């Protein structure tokens, strides 16, 4: 969950998000080192009285500034590709949920059950209870089992939307006429909030997403009560 004045990411709740956090730290360190080197060279150029006006050719320098950036790019690309493949890999999901975007609400269908579907609308500010979050609470939460692989099928009934839950490392476009898929697995129970992340009209900011991750036995009780 995000909090005021937050400068970093939300706490990771899935293996994918943990990998993304490690990759961010890895890349940020490389950027920091490069920036420090560039600032150091600039400061030397501004303060030193030594100049090299007669240098016409420097093969060694050209070799270094060609090979070194290539190595740095490889160091960034390899872990990035690894995470991309991990995000696309879906092996034997335990549950499939179909998500449809609308202007301006979400519809969910548990395809493994015969008749388990519902719409999820934002609760207006005037109807919020004490302790509930403004513009983030919904009338029907998406209840899912924790520590299980879940496949999300995502599409749209009208315009472009984007189904995003930051703490799970999820962001998948909802495109009319196209069915995208992603996978999620939570390592701990709790409420996890997200929002539509694609400008979709005047009420774009009123399309929250709330996932309630619970142990399997509680999910089974909930699904039985919904049928």
UniProtKB/Swiss-Prot annotation:
Mg(2+) binds at residue 198. It is a multi-pass membrane protein. It comes from the Eukaryota. Its cofactor is Cu cation. The modification Phosphotyrosine is found at residue 218. It catalyses: 4 Fe(II)-[cytochrome c] + O2 + 8 H(+)(in) = 4 Fe(III)-[cytochrome c] + 2 H2O + 4 H(+)(out). Pfam families: COX2, COX2_TM. GO terms for molecular function: copper ion binding; cytochrome-c oxidase activity. SUPFAM superfamilies: Cupredoxins, Cytochrome c oxidase subunit II-like, transmembrane region. Its main location: mitochondrion. Component of the cytochrome c oxidase (complex IV, CIV), a multisubunit enzyme composed of 14 subunits. The complex is composed of a catalytic core of 3 subunits MT-CO1, MT-CO2 and MT-CO3, encoded in the mitochondrial DNA, and 11 supernumerary subunits COX4I, COX5A, COX5B, COX6A, COX6B, COX6C, COX7A, COX7B, COX7C, COX8 and NDUFA4, which are encoded in the nuclear genome. This is Cytochrome c oxidase subunit 2.
